[in-house]
Amino acid sequence: MWTALVLIWIFSLSLSESHAASNDPRNFVPNKMWKGLVKRNASVETVDNKTSEDVTMAAASPVTLTKGTSAAHLNSMEVTTEDTSRTDVSEPATSGGAADGVTSIAPTAVASSTTAASITTAASSMTVASSAPTTAASSTTVASIAPTTAASSMTAASSTPMTLALPAPTSTSTGRTPSTTATGHPSLSTALAQVPKSSALPRTATLATLATRAQTVATTANTSSPMSTRPSPSKHMPSDTAASPVPPMRPQAQGPISQVSVDQPVVNTTNKSTPMPSNTTPEPAPTPTVVTTTKAQAREPTASPVPVPHTSPIPEMEAMSPTTQPSPMPYTQRAAGPGTSQAPEQVETEATPGTDSTGPTPRSSGGTKMPATDSCQPSTQGQYMVVTTEPLTQAVVDKTLLLVVLLLGVTLFITVLVLFALQAYESYKKKDYTQVDYLINGMYADSEM
């Protein structure tokens, strides 16, 4: 089977090179496919005829490049895509010719040829549905082709995943045709998402992806294709219904590339449900905050009167500093300050002011003593002159010592001056003596005299 598929693929490559020279190499096909994905998602959002036609032109050509069933199939698909932009009615004939070409080129695998024939019809129906959804004739042709493609999609999903190893994109097109007839646009996004996988990955990966997705598409085909094949407007009606939930799907449906039309309302319901918890979550969020604020407010007033008497030593300190400025009344005022909280302290402070200073000390031993002493210092300046004179006596002693030292220094200086004056006077008396007298006598004459 693999050898037959490889031979068919090589033969298709040779025919593709001979009949139609592709401008772009096959290495860049996945890039085109992803570009087609982006464009297809844009067309799903806008749901316009022109955008859908452009998308089919951009997406179908890379699909044909990646298809490996036959070269004639590639060429015929390119011709059909070119014809889709021009004429819509002539496409089923070209698709039928493409199917004949495919069957003639692939005589080895009958099942693959039949699936290829159904695939080509499905692809042509896709191009017709995507390129010209407004024409009634093309819609009827798609409607007539859709049952066969639905049946072929069922067979492709159930019986021929083995033959769909290389022509995986085409098999996905067969699985997509009912979904395109049902929803129109999102199926192409799945097709484009699957094409690079089927073109680059081996058969096992394609079987895994195609078996799951084609089965889901086949199940939706059973539900959606009969609705779409009966009248042509029914095809447009689900497309409109699919287009209506598409705008809310934009952030999510484009990312995972919605596979089935059934997934769209599911995503819509999730979109609808997600804002509800998001809205509800902030609503309870402020309510506990309000509760906490009310609790904090309730706690603050309750805590504020209670610790005021307990923490009163700190305000007592503040109150003590101004109240102790008048010397006779500091203790009574301090007793009146905390007296509002504790009455027995008033009696104790009135009886013994010393105990009042020791009263706040058990509350805060070091805090109240310091301001008490600080407050007592300015008050005691008027009360205890003896206490204040002690540093003054020391200063006077220091000053007296300095004065004594000055007097001693002055007396010494005066004595030195007197001595110098006496010596000067003596020298002045002896100025008349000459040097000869001094030499002869050895002394001054006045000294003897």
Swiss-Prot record:
The UniProt entry, under InterPro entries, shows: DUF5585, Erythrocyte_Invasion_ImmMod
Query: Per the record, what ranges lie on the membrane's Cytoplasmic side?
Result: 422-449
Where composition is biased (Low complexity), the residues are 154-184, 215-234
Q: Which ranges does the record list as Extracellular topological domains?
A: 21-400
Q: Does the keyword Cytoplasm apply?
A: no
Q: Where is this region: Disordered?
A: 72-101, 154-187, 215-381
Annotated Gene Ontology cellular component terms: Golgi apparatus; intracellular membrane-bounded organelle; nucleoplasm; plasma membrane
Full protein name? Uncharacterized protein C11orf24
**Organism (species):** Homo sapiens
